[in-house]
Design a protein with these regions (language model features):
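Catalytic domains of cell-wall/extracellular-matrix polysaccharide-remodeling enzymes
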Residues: 1-122
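Short, solvent-exposed mixed-charge patches
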Residues: 127-129
Length: 129
């Protein structure tokens, strides 16, 4: 993580503050380690499955059929057909009334919990009275 962060910082001039755990695998120890580095973990609730090298139409149909308000969609930078699929995905979602926003507008500040679908929810507060 440190080596990747250094490379990203060198290229962008900005240190990363978010991280997607590989395969979405994490536990309390991973989250604690990430947070000790000044970062927050993020998850997704729509997997494009673009890594399976599906064609652009299949990726587009999969994503647009699963997106809901507040969705975070997982794409991979090395996937073969993602660049071809993205314009159609964006056109469809915008035509359906969605707005594409930076992930920073979708994630909650701690404390929060993440459910099995990857969605964040404010952590429940426990009353001590």
């Amino acid at each position: 993580v440190t080596a990747s962060n250094e490379r990203i910082s060198a290229v962008t001039g900005v240190p990363p503050t978010l991280i997607r755990c590989p395969y979405g695998e994490y536990d309390d120890h991973v989250i604690a380690a990430i947070r000790s580095m000044g970062m927050e973990p993020i998850q997704w609730d729509v997997d494009s499955l673009d890594w399976k090298d599906y064609d652009a139409d299949t990726i587009c149909r999969r994503v647009t059929s699963k997106v809901q308000p507040g969705s975070i969609v997982l794409f991979h930078n090395a996937a073969l057909h993602t660049p071809e699929a993205l314009p159609a995905i964006l056109d469809c979602l915008i035509n359906d009334g969605y707005t594409v926003v930076p992930i920073s507008q979708l994630i909650l500040d701690p404390p929060y919990t993440i459910d099995h679908t990857g969605r964040q929810f404010p952590a429940e507060t426990v009353s001590t009275t």
